[in-house]
Each structure stands twice: as C-alpha cells, then as structure tokens.
Amino acid sequence: MSPVKTSTENKVDPEKTAGSDLEKIPLPDVLKNLEADPSAGLTAAEAQARLAKYGPNALPEKKVNPIRKILGYLTGPIAYMIEAAAIVSAIIGHWEDFAIIFALLAFNTTLDFWQDMKATSALEALKKGLALDATVMRDGKWVGVKADRIVPGDIVKIRLGMIVPADMRLVSGDYASIDQAALTGESLPVSKQVGDLAYSGSVVRQGEMIGVVVGTGLNTYLGRTAKLVAGAGAVSHAQKAMFTIGNFLIILAVILVIVLVLIEVYRSLVVAHSFDLADAANLLQLVLVLLVASIPVAMPAVFSVTMALGAVALSKQGAIVSRLESIEEMAGVDTLCSDKTGTLTKNQLKVGDPILISATDPKDVIKWAALASQASSGDPIDKAVLEAVTDASLVAGYTQGKFVPFDPVTKRVEATLTDAQGNTIHAAKGAPQAILALTGISGDAAQPVTDHVARLAARGYRALGVATSSDGKQWKYLGILPMSDPPRDDSRSTIADAREKGLRVKMVTGDDTAIAKEMAREIGLGTNIIAADEAFPKDMNPDHLPESTKDLVESADGFARVFPQHKYAIVKALQQRNHLVSMTGDGVNDAPALKQADCGVAVSGAVDAARSAAALILTRPGLSTINSAIDEARQIFGRITSYTIYRVALTLDIMFIVVAGTVFFGLIPLTAVMIVIISLLDDIPIMTIAYDNTVISPRPIRWRMPRILSVSALLGVFSIIQSFFWLMIGFAILHHPDWSTNLGLTDEAHLQTLVFLQLVVGGHLLLLITRTEHWFFLRPFPSWQLLSAIIATQVVVVLICGFGWFVPALSAAMIALTWAYNILWMIILGVIRKVTEVWLDGRTSGRAHHTELVHQPLQPHLHSS
C-alpha cells in the first residue's frame, strides 16, 4: 500500500493540540500540519529543532530538594509540639529529656520519609513502559535511535514484538495487530490500518506498518495517564484523625499553659513579690511537663506498627500492602470499583457451544476452526479455538500448507490443508459477515446468521464464523463459534461476600456495553451498565463534575467503554459523595484511579505501573483475597480506635492532674522523666494490641471523631477525678504524721511517685476497658500477648516504685493501696463506658455494630483466650 499524499487543508498547531486533534483530523492534514514526508522523514537538523521545541519523548522527572522534603516531615501539630518540648528541654538544660524527645521525632521523620519514597515509584514504573529504541527514517534512511529522541513528525516503522515508541498515525503498510490491553483494557489485540492511531507503550503482535508521530512524552495517551497518576492521591484518613486529635490536645494544652503561666506569675509577683531566673526556669520546666504530657508522641508509631503487623498477616493471605494507611481505609471502604478484564474475568477467551448452520455435528465446526489456526501465532482467538479441541484425533492426519493470517480488509483467516489421503481442503474462520461474503450467502438465506450474531452480541459474546471448501471457490458455511472471556470461578461468590460486608461493587471496563452487561449478569451484579463516554461531559473536570453525573455514578452498577480519565473521574465522583472507594485493576490505564482511590488494589499479574500506584497488591488471582483483607482491616481499625480512645483519655488525665496539682496544692505532681517513663510503659502493651482479639464489623467503619472524642473525653474526665482523689488522699497522708510515717509517704517527692504509680496502674486497667465497646469482663478476652505485656509492665512499675529506680521508693503498703484503689475505679469506669455506648447508640443511626468475634488471630499459632 502506497503512502498517503498530503492535502491543502488548514493547519493545526501541534504544540497547542498536544496531539489530541492530530489523532482525529484526516491523515493528509496530519502530514501537512507536521510537515512530514513519509518517503524521506525528517532531516537531522529538523529533528534536533523539534526536540528543542517539544522536549524529549519521556515522562518528566520532578526533582524535589531532599532537605525541603525532610523539613516537610517536621511540620504538623504533633511535630510542632514535639519540637517545642525539645527546645524547652534544651533551654533549661534537661539534656536527657531533650535526647529522648529528639529520638522520638527522628523515628517519626524516618518513617514518614520511607512512606513518601514509595509514593514516587508509580511514575518510575510508568517510565519502564516506554520503548527504549525505535526505527526512524532520518534524511531518507532508516536508522535506529533512542525512543526519547523521537519528535512529532518523525516517520517510524513498527513490527512484530516492538513496543510502539510514541503516539502515531499509521500512514502505510498492510495491517498490524496491536495489544493495547494494558492501556485501554481491551482484552483482544486491535487490528490497525492506515489512518488508525497506535498508542505509545502498546505492543505489536502481528504485522508491520509505518506511522507518523503525533504525540511524544506527556502528550501521548500513556503520558496523559502518567500525568493523572502524578496528580492523583487521597489524603490518609488516619492522618486526618491524628491531626484532629493533635489539634484537640494542642488547643487544650495551650489553654492550660496560659492558665498555669498566669497563676505562677501571679504567685511570684503579687504574692511572693519576686520573680527571678530560678522562678523562670521552674516555670519553663512546668511548661515542659505539660507539653510532653499533651503530645501523643507515640501515636504515629503505634498506628504504623499496628498496621505493619496487619500487613504481615495480609501478606500470608496473598495481599501485599504498599501503603500502610490503606489498611485502616480498607475498613471503611463502601464502594469497590473493579476492572473487568483479568480481574472479574480470566482474561482468556473461551469457545462456547457451536451454533450449526450447515454442519450437522458441533465437533465439525470446532475441528475446521482449529485447522484454520496456528498455535505458534500467539493469537488469543487461535489459542481459544485450539483449546476447544477435546479430541486430538479430530485434527490428526491433516497437514497445514498455505496459511493466510488475519487480514483487516477481508476480516478472515484462511488455511489450505492436506488430509491423510492427499486430498486438499480449504478452511476459513473470521467475522460472521465476512464468512457470509466468502460463501456467497445473501438476502433471506443470510438472515439466520445475522440473527444468531445479533443474539450473541446482546448476550456479550463475540462470534466467529467457520467455513470449508474443497476447491477454494465454493464455500460451505458450517457454523458459528460463540466466544467470551469467562468470569473467574470465584467472582460471583466474592461479589456476594462483598455485599454481605456492606460494599457496593461497580464494574469498570473498556469493553462494549453488551459484553459488560452479560458479564454483570453472570457474576451477579446489577445490569445498570452505562457507557462512560455518554455519562461524562466531553471536557470534564473531575474536581467539578455536575451533580447529575455524580448521581449517575452512584446509581450505576458499572461502566463500559471506559478510558483512564473516566476511571479517575468515577473514583473522584464517588469520593465527592463521601464514599470511601477501592479500585481494582491491572493495567497502566488503571494507575491514576488506583492512586486516587482510598485503597487502590492491583490484582495478580498487574503491570508495574498499576502495582506501584496501588496501596494493596494481590499475589493470588481473583478478588477473594479482598474479603480477607477487609476482615483484617476492620480488626485493625477496631484496635486503632481502641488505642485512640485510650491515648486521649490518658493524656487528658495526665495534663489535668499536672494543672490540678499545681493550682490546688502548689506541687508539680510529675517530673518530665516520670512522664517519659509513663509514655514508654504505656506504649509497650499498645504495641501488642495488634494481636488482640477483637470483633469484625459487618458494615464499613470509619473514623467517627465526634463519638471517639466524646467517649475519650468522658473517660478522661472520670480518670481525672480518679487521679485527683488519689492525689488528695496522698496529700492528706503526707500531712498526717502517723499515716505519713506508717505508709512511708514522707515528702512531696514520694507523693510524686504515688501519682506516677497510680497513672501507670490506672492507665493499663483503662486499656482493658477501652479495647471493647462491651463489658470488659466478657468475650472477646484480651489476647495472651496483650495480657502478658500489661502484667510485665505492671511488674516493672512495681519494681521501679518498690526499689526506688529513677524515683523515690514507696512502701509495699502504699503500692497495695494504690492497686486496690485502681481496681475499684476499673469497675466504675467499665460501667461508665458501657452506659455511654448504649446512650450513644440510641442517638446515632446507621452505626456499624460489631457482632462477629475474630476466631483467627494475626499469626496461626496464636489463640484467643
């Protein structure tokens, strides 16, 4: 086929069109606009000038200053408070405190840096999809050049096995079969002819053609997908929760600091009539204690460790977590957007029961279709037909001679065969209408074939016509082979399980609407499948979609004829309607939506770009692993929620007891070192909460901050009352000579130790209350890991207080009294927690109730009590 000649139509500015108009306008106009000559190509000088104008054919790298990136991790409410505490420690010379606080800050920064580095890998994976070398005509000769040196207007040759190096319009050649499944989601290679567009990053499976480059770098289909990935990304709900909690505690701490400073300055200037450097240092120390007490410094680490242990459990079930926050977000996912090809289906064509036209035996239709196929071609249709042959004797004894591969013009394949007796037979297979033309059947005689094809299309099947001839002239139409990409064996059950967990499943596919509807019917989805190009505005902005479009997205069971920008917009639309969205996929075309989704899931066999953009990567085929992931996520979420309630309540207790002791007794009830020890002892059991026995919610669960803060505040208030009463009792003992002597509480330093012991014992007993919404003495019981950690830390704190390690020693009697007092308050707080939950349940509709006990702990050898 000869090259296309140029015409004299108006030009289109290639720099302004970014390749999009050049994909649509007539081919002669493309050549004229790009000043491209298919017979000579560009000169070296022209290529160099265009390279300078349009840039390299590569995805640009965004360079980030490492120092600026690290400094970015040191911002935020919790980080600011940690830094403030460290600065105050340095000012007053408390270098031990400074070292401990700085070490915690460094740990959190390192963890953030590691997580952020993983986020940049999506673009790197997309770059790997680009071709490395290309055959280009320069100065009238075919030469090999690096793909990143290709420019718009270059004449490029593509052939079997090559990766298309740039978006190009094909200008000459017979045909090419191009696999663009990773880009568009189409399950079969697409036949290309002169004038068609070949996408950058797609793979040539058959044929050889020549094209003119119309888009490079970010101006290609692949490049625009990469740009979407770069701009995608949702803020972690765990981060939002930590910021909310941090802000709540910081505001409270600032108020308390102001109150304390005013009181202390008043006492020094008005009452004592003096305020020297020593007073200022003491005041700074007081501020330091309050700041350290107000900061949940271990909260980011505890969140990460809890989710990391959950990630280990998920990996054993065939799901690898690339972004830890996705675990808790999976717990709240209420909408699952699933790619069809290779995710809900096997991505393998399968032949259905043959439809007979003139043949009398269905096996004959399969037999002659197989004889018109080649196993070595790699063609998925040939593979499916050959796999449909269950009896090898059907095709034995035949020798394939001449073979004419698929021709996009005739739309069929022909083979000349010789049987064991030396007879020649011709076989053909192809589009049903093409086989009709080959057999010469027309008019009413062709109606049965047309009707069968229409019925198959309505059910989502592709149709393959089969014919034979003894002389190559007179052909007999044997029958039609229905072909489909069948659903995975577990797809229907997985979708049913997902619905039981409160998830709405939506199918998203690049295939035609009829195919999508049939697949939806087979796997138990609804059949409200909408064509994406009809649903979305032509020049849509995903951030400002019409309300009507959002309504459509919410109500639809799935979308057909979907392109990357549609998938991305579907996720955005659902998120704008307050849905937590999980998106599954396996191709480059899925990457933007995978990254934007609250929990992107790359299924088994996904390309690198999809795996890098996803938060969860499945190593086993199908979606069944997602059900296990959801259960695990909801367990972990329950544990994190329990920790959050505990941490806020205990922090309130510590902050207010410091203020109360200072205001009412003129005593700082805790030293900074004591607070650091409390923090360490409290977080040891928390690290084992990842192994705790909890319950699974049958519905999606989210961060309900008003409820969490309400429960935390109420428990915190009663914990403050508990601690304040014990401080009052201790103060009374201290000022009663007989009690003071008998119980060994002889000075304010011992009183500080008493408060320290009460907070550690009471705090750990409080953890047993916050770990469940039900009565703390009923199932599920604490795991042996959590219980062992609590017992171990209690032994440690008793030894610290009994032997006077780091603190003045307490008597055995005082330690025993402290334990008895806290056990009594544990019962009181347990009643308060249960009554609070019942009251909140009465006020809150649509609450996710925890009803199912977890029977499988994180590790196989661990068992619940």
Give the residues covered by each predicted segment.
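Non-lumenal N-terminal regulatory segments of integral membrane proteins
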Residues: 1-151, 156-164, 169-177, 181-247, ...
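Helix-interface capping motifs at the ends of transmembrane segments in multi-pass membrane proteins
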Residues: 80-100, 252-295, 312-318, 651-674, ...
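Hydrophobic alpha-helical transmembrane segments
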Residues: 92, 96, 100-131, 236-335, ...
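Conserved beta-strand/loop elements of the cytosolic catalytic core of P-type E1-E2 ATPases, chiefly
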Residues: 107, 111, 141, 214-217, ...
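Basic, amphipathic juxtamembrane/active-site segments
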Residues: 177-179, 184, 346-366, 521-525, ...
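Membrane-embedded transport module
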Residues: 260, 306-309, 527-583, 597, ...
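Cytosolic catalytic regions of ATP/NTP-dependent phosphoryl-transfer enzymes
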Residues: 329-477, 483, 496, 505-524, ...
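C-terminal transmembrane module of polytopic membrane proteins
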Residues: 733, 753-865
